């Protein structure tokens, strides 16, 4: 038995074969998928402890030459440029440039960013915070809270992609 364990250990850590490489990948995947990810979920209080941004809804740049419904052939990416095009919506909904400038992740997220999450506490969620929630699609949505209100003892949040 001891000899078998030694051979297995040697195969995983010292063998240079493709089979050793593949075995390491499979074991790493299984450990992350069934131990690390659930443990993180338990500690952070969420079923999605790690998510990747898969859409451009929180980016502050152009996509297909469009940003906030306006077409640009060139767009200098900066907070001021973003606000000059998209800020009108926020201002018409009671959010000033100064307020937005103090929001967490004021520059949004880029497609491909990886985010570590923890369970939100509804008692301290406010306009400007970023929420990740399950919509009608299988992928979770990442949007910014733009309005909070109570109705019939229920708290509601309006969210918007930047």
Q: Where in this protein do the model-derived segments appear?
A:
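Extended, hydrophilic extramembrane loops/domains of integral membrane proteins
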Residues: 146-162
């Amino acid at each position: 038995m001891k000899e078998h364990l030694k051979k297995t250990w040697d195969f995983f850590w010292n063998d240079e074969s493709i089979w050793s490489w593949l075995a390491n990948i499979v074991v790493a995947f299984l450990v992350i998928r069934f131990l690390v990810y659930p443990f993180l979920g338990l500690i952070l209080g969420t079923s999605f402890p790690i998510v990747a941004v898969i859409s451009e809804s929180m980016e502050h740049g152009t996509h297909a030459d469009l940003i906030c419904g306006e077409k640009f052939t060139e767009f200098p990416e900066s907070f001021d440029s973003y606000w000059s095009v998209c800020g009108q919506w926020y201002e018409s909904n009671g959010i000033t440039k100064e307020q937005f400038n103090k929001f967490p992740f004021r520059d949004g997220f880029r497609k491909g960013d990886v985010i570590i999450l923890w369970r939100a506490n509804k008692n301290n969620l406010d306009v400007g915070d970023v929420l990740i929630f399950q919509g009608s699609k299988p992928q979770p949505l990442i949007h910014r809270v733009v309005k909070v209100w109570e109705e019939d003892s229920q708290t509601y949040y309006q969210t918007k992609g930047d």
